[in-house]
Amino acid sequence: MRRLIPIVGALVVIAAPAPSGWAQSGGTPAPDFSEPCPPVYPGDSAARERLARWMARGAADRGMPHELPVMAAIAESGLRNLSGSTYAGYFGMHESLNTGDYRGFRRNPDLQLRWFLDTAALVRQRRVAVGRPDPAADPSSFGSWIADVERPAPENRTGYQPHLGEAGDLIAGKCAAPVRDDTAAPRLEARIARPQHPLATGGVVVRLRCPDSDCLAGVTVMIGTRTTRSAAREPAPTGFTTLTAPLSRKTRRKLRAAGTARATITVIAADNAANTTSRTRVVTLEG
């Protein structure tokens, strides 16, 4: 606490200005209803267009398509902040998610949107890490991307893509384009042995690391026109991590019969902005 210094002479009274409305509200600015693409949650009773654009802006700030969260919310809740006993919010979040970073999501739509976008970013990262196309580049893949986030029953996975047009109509081009300020690919170091013995090791084995940043990594194995993929995995923070890409039963059978086969091995690293780096080597598979 600073020491008070007595003032000798007349007491000077300085009138402090009245606190602004912003300060009186506890530091939270009131929603700007003139903003066509609101940065602040507009409220449960807001028009569907404003709710959709709030979601679209949040997605764009994370480098993801405007329509993605809107399509999900239309399908899961009809674009309403539901309060069911087991599933709640705009995205039908299960009660088991009410913990950690998302604790209190039922009363906080910002947390709901954060959960959806966090999970969508992870799904996207996993896809590109195993050599699949970036779903953000193809609007026809938005539905399957959402399905990997929401994880509905298999028969309901196709229920998201039909809402692409409605989502676009609600957003109506009012929001700025998705941010793409992180374009630096992760640095990848990979060790791919030229002779491989997949029948003994359970698949094609590689060792890798991302020395400068967090990443997810995967392996693809192409033999002729057939491609198999490992699951994406986060490498250990230090040293090299071993990944194994299993071969199909048919490929193993052919390898036993032929004795050897040529394969193209690609190791891929992806960061959380879906930037990728790859290393490729042609190897000999020995039975």
Label every PLM stretch briefly.
Residues 1-24:
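Secretory targeting and sorting signals
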Residues 21-32, 37, 50, 57, ...:
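Polybasic, low-complexity, intrinsically disordered segments
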Residues 66-75, 81-83:
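Short beta-strand segments
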Residues 155-180, 278-287:
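Extracellularly exposed regions in secreted/surface proteins, prominently low-complexity, repeat-rich
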Residues 54-56, 71:
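Membrane-embedded alpha-helical segments and adjacent helix-loop junctions characteristic
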